[in-house]
Amino acid sequence: MVRIQRRKLLASCLCVTATVFLLVTLQVMVELGKFERKEFKSSSLQDGHTKMEEAPTHLNSFLKKEGLTFNRKRKWELDSYPIMLWWSPLTGETGRLGQCGADACFFTINRTYLHHHMTKAFLFYGTDFNIDSLPLPRKAHHDWAVFHEESPKNNYKLFHKPVITLFNYTATFSRHSHLPLTTQYLESIEVLKSLRYLVPLQSKNKLRKRLAPLVYVQSDCDPPSDRDSYVRELMTYIEVDSYGECLRNKDLPQQLKNPASMDADGFYRIIAQYKFILAFENAVCDDYITEKFWRPLKLGVVPVYYGSPSITDWLPSNKSAILVSEFSHPRELASYIRRLDSDDRLYEAYVEWKLKGEISNQRLLTALRERKWGVQDVNQDNYIDAFECMVCTKVWANIRLQEKGLPPKRWEAEDTHLSCPEPTVFAFSPLRTPPLSSLREMWISSFEQSKKEAQALRWLVDRNQNFSSQEFWGLVFKD
């Protein structure tokens, strides 16, 4: 009987808590809605747009967390909640009161809150960051934060100091950012140790009668890393099975040709049969490490890696991948792979860590243990939630400093938060290397122009006035 009464009491408390939270959230929405309607009529956005933009669809797979339990001890007032305005309509949320630990912030994509006195931070999605409309003039209490987990080729302007230092807070693939996303494609240590897809070496040796030692799967051809040129040259020295649109010489089953099938069990089973995989990133940047590296490690295939110069900091063990950068020419790389292919003892040295389930890299272990978000884990926040809460928490910290009469802490991004060298192209044999295509040429010229764009944008933002695209491009091509 006592247990039943306790359960009833607990249920009653939960109902009361939920009711209070719903009422508070509703009141916030009503009050902000009044402001929104007022601003909708008299908005002075620089581009003249007052209509809310649609959210992009490429991140729809990330589930947003709902508003969490409201702290009833804090006296509710509309002015109690800093507004975090997504200037890029990434989340698609017109308004949500989100709890971040002991703090709460109002998150929205609605630009009519630009002039609200409680708007404290503007959140940008790196790929969508452009000069068409920026929240200018920028007030002293307006923080800017950028979230950029995608390829550098999507927006080169961000990779130059004049632009990246416009932001107060960053979430990027760099370990140096305020919220590092370096391991964004790695679910957990357990998936690295898993033997689920591992094909025994004896079986792989038998499969070699019909399979090449190397496999290559890419459909994004001629990216800034110029990987296709390298692989094309490599193919003249060793057999490579290429399944993607780039350099294709082998076909996947029809049901696996869709790019969405790259994480399908059937695709994994095919790739796991190979001894080696060419894991080439589409761009060369410190800490830019994608599924191209982690996938083969999960499947028990040795990655032949080209991409992040800092990849050795993230290897599960010292001998878990073959690094292209250690070979002066594809011919030498091919010779080394043939040697491993013919010597089981040498090959097994690269998968020993997986067979034993031993990961010796403490940096990797620490990064996964301490990151504040999860990958495909319903029990953890995703990295967008973590980014929002990072900004919310830092904004609140400064509010509390000011309440004590102290100056707020000034946060600023550094150029190390996104670091990529200028793209280069491979040039091996003049007879086999194709002439520079328009796409291959584009990455180099685009990077060069982005330097001028970054300088022009910085000058205009520092001027702190609205500007037109004509004014921007006039500065870019001034010389």
From Swiss-Prot:
Cellular component GO terms, alphabetical: endoplasmic reticulum; endoplasmic reticulum membrane; Golgi apparatus; Golgi membrane; lysosome; nucleoplasm
Disulfide feature: 389-392
Entry comment describing in which tissues the protein is expressed: Expressed in lung, digestive tract, gall bladder, placenta, kidney, uterus and brain. Not detected in spleen, heart, muscle, liver and pancreas.
Any one GO biological process: fertilization
Keywords assigned: Disulfide bond, Endoplasmic reticulum, Glycoprotein, Glycosyltransferase, Golgi apparatus, Lysosome, Membrane, Signal-anchor, Transferase, Transmembrane, Transmembrane helix
Entry's EC annotation: 2.4.1.221, 2.4.1.-
Record-annotated membrane-spanning stretches: 9-31
Location(s), subcellular: Endoplasmic reticulum membrane
Topological domain spans for side Lumenal: 32-479
One Pfam family from the record: Glyco_transf_10
Enzyme class: transferase
GO molecular function: alpha-(1->3)-fucosyltransferase activity; fucosyltransferase activity; peptide-O-fucosyltransferase activity
Residues linked to a glycan: 110, 168
Pathway: Protein modification; protein glycosylation
Catalytic activity, reaction form: L-threonyl-[protein] + GDP-beta-L-fucose = 3-O-(alpha-L-fucosyl)-L-threonyl-[protein] + GDP + H(+); L-seryl-[protein] + GDP-beta-L-fucose = 3-O-(alpha-L-fucosyl)-L-seryl-[protein] + GDP + H(+)
Membrane-related topology note: Single-pass type II membrane protein
Cytoplasmic topological segments: 1-8
Function comment: Protein O-fucosyltransferase that specifically catalyzes O-fucosylation of serine or threonine residues in EMI domains of target proteins, such as MMRN1, MMRN2 and EMID1. Attaches fucose through an O-glycosidic linkage. O-fucosylation of EMI domain-containing proteins may be required for facilitating protein folding and secretion. May also show alpha-(1,3)-fucosyltransferase activity toward the innermost N-acetyl glucosamine (GlcNAc) residue in biantennary N-glycan acceptors. However, this was tested with a library of synthetic substrates and this activity is unsure in vivo.
Family recorded in the similarity comment: Belongs to the glycosyltransferase 10 family.
Name of the protein this chain belongs to: GDP-fucose protein O-fucosyltransferase 3
Record gene name: FUT10
